[in-house]
Design a protein with these regions (language model features):
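Phosphate-binding loop of NTP-binding sites
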Residues: 10, 89-222, 226-234, 426, ...
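Residue-level signal for inorganic ion chemistry
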Residues: 9, 39, 58, 93, ...
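N-terminal leader/targeting and accessory segments in enzymes
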Residues: 1-92, 351-354, 380-381, 385-395
């Protein structure tokens, strides 16, 4: 964050003229341990700690103002910014700060693939100038303002991920960020328990248009039936990408899966035909790459430079990260999971070159009433994925195991991380491959920690 006057940063939260013009803000924090002279401390009430208990101490440590939901003992009225909703305060400050700078910005949302698409878009743009992106899971009403406050006078591009669990959230994020280009990767069933239907999820994702200017490109997946039939706002310019239809603005042809990535021919009706290779597995990642390409080129970046950037893409966390360990190939994809991403991962894995295929699949969380049906469908998909052995973990994944076993798949349900790791260690051989996928809350990385440690001990 670069220095900004408190009056500009707090506009909309305080009456005009109530903040002395000479007061400067050097940072904004919600963590009392990070309070420094010149900062604004935002108090959030929490289950374990209430930030209001640290507001007075924050002023002692140099904070110029504290944002609080109510008057706090020890905090002078002239130092308190009263706001009943701390998230709203963060969003207002993020929007005010962002308005001081003019990077070319891409906003990314969608039910599946938005984080990977964000990473790919960052890779596509980074070669053209200083670029920032959303880090980790900072894609909500607390994290996105923090990302906006990382923009500086030298920032040329910004890639902002926008997540949501309820209608209206992306509208607020988009209006604060004001991207130049929007991306919607696809419409799945994540958060369907909150929104009721995929049609409503589609409407919620389209809220990104609220922050797009007149004539802005909106990059959309032509292969998604909900997006294709959606009524788009008149002020945006759709840019369609597809893996199946050559009539789309940008499509992928001759798609091939290799041992460490995907290759394909990219046909852009506006800019020509190019050969592309990405270090990411699966057709779904080809779609993510097309979305990133569309956004970067419609911002005016040269296609050749964009494609070079995509070839250097680096995945974050355990998202289809390929690890070679003692002769076994492990595809770590345990950061998140839903029915759409599970289907894509199994489709990728079925084409993965190896001796025998093993899968460790865990629960998909937050599916509400769809959970039972989704986990049974996962069992049917697993049975069609040429697996040598399926190991499941989690209460919901028991249904997956039952259905897969009934269809002839060699199946084992584990009740602990140790049991899951042992089941794999006892059965896997050099040349085999393992897909590990579940929702992040299932913590299947703990199985991998045991698995790798036991492999190492066996070698020693």
């Amino acid at each position: 964050m670069e220095k900004i006057s408190a009056s500009k940063l707090l506009a909309g939260l305080v009456p005009a003229g109530s903040i002395p013009e000479e007061v400067q803000v050097e940072s904004v924090t919600t963590d009392s341990r990070e309070v420094r002279p010149g900062c604004i401390f935002v108090a959030f009430p929490g289950e374990k700690f209430d930030g209001h208990d640290f507001a007075a101490k924050a002023l002692e440590n140099g904070a110029v103002y504290v944002v609080v939901n109510h008057p706090v003992e020890g905090v002078p009225a002239e130092k308190a910014i009263l706001c009943p909703d701390s998230y709203h305060a963060m969003m207002v400050m993020g929007a005010n700060y962002r308005s001081q700078y003019h990077p070319r910005m891409v906003g990314v949302t969608g039910s599946v693939g938005k984080t990977t698409t964000k990473q790919m878009t960052y890779a596509a743009l980074a070669g053209f100038g200083e670029t920032i992106k959303t880090e980790g899971n900072q894609n909500n009403e607390l994290g996105m303002p923090r990302t906006l406050m990382r923009i500086g006078s030298s920032t040329e591009y910004a890639v902002i991920e926008m997540g949501m669990s309820h209608a209206g959230e992306i509208d607020r994020l988009a209006r604060a960020a004001r991207p130049d280009v929007g991306i919607i990767t696809c419409i799945g069933v994540s958060h369907i328990g909150n929104l009721g239907s995929q049609e409503n999820i589609c409407k919620a994702k389209l809220e990104i248009c609220a922050g797009l200017p007149e004539g802005a490109p909106l990059v959309l997946n032509y292969d998604d039936p909900f997006l294709r039939k959606a009524k788009l706002p008149e002020h945006v310019r759709p840019v369609w990408f597809s893996l199946t239809d050559e009539n789309a603005d940008v499509c992928a042809l001759s798609i091939r899966q290799e041992t460490d990535g995907m290759s394909f021919v990219l046909e852009d009706q506006e800019k020509g035909t190019f050969v592309v290779r990405i270090p990411a597995m699966g057709r779904h990642n080809v779609a993510n790459a097309l979305a990133a390409y569309c956004a970067a080129t419609r911002l005016g970046c040269d296609p050749h430079g964009v494609i070079k950037g995509l070839s250097n893409f680096e995945q974050t966390g355990r998202r289809q990260k390929v690890v070679h360990s003692k002769g076994v190939t492990v595809i770590e994809d345990c950061y998140n999971a839903n029915p759409d991403s599970m289907k894509a991962a199994l489709a990728m894995f079925r084409e993965f070159p190896c001796k025998r295929r093993f899968a460790l699949l865990g629960d998909m969380l937050e599916l509400g009433e769809l959970s039972r049906e989704a986990h049974e469908e996962l069992g049917r998909l697993a049975a069609e994925s040429d697996l040598y052995c399926l190991v499941t973990y989690g209460e919901n994944a028991k249904r997956t195991a039952v259905v897969a076993a009934a269809k002839g798949v060699k199946t084992l349900h584990a009740d602990s991380y140790r049991e899951a790791a042992d089941a794999l260690l006892d059965r896997m051989e050099s040349g085999d491959a393992l897909l590990v996928k579940a929702s992040h809350g299932m913590a299947l990385e703990k199985v991998l920690e045991i698995f790798y440690a036991e492999q190492k001990d066996a070698e020693e």
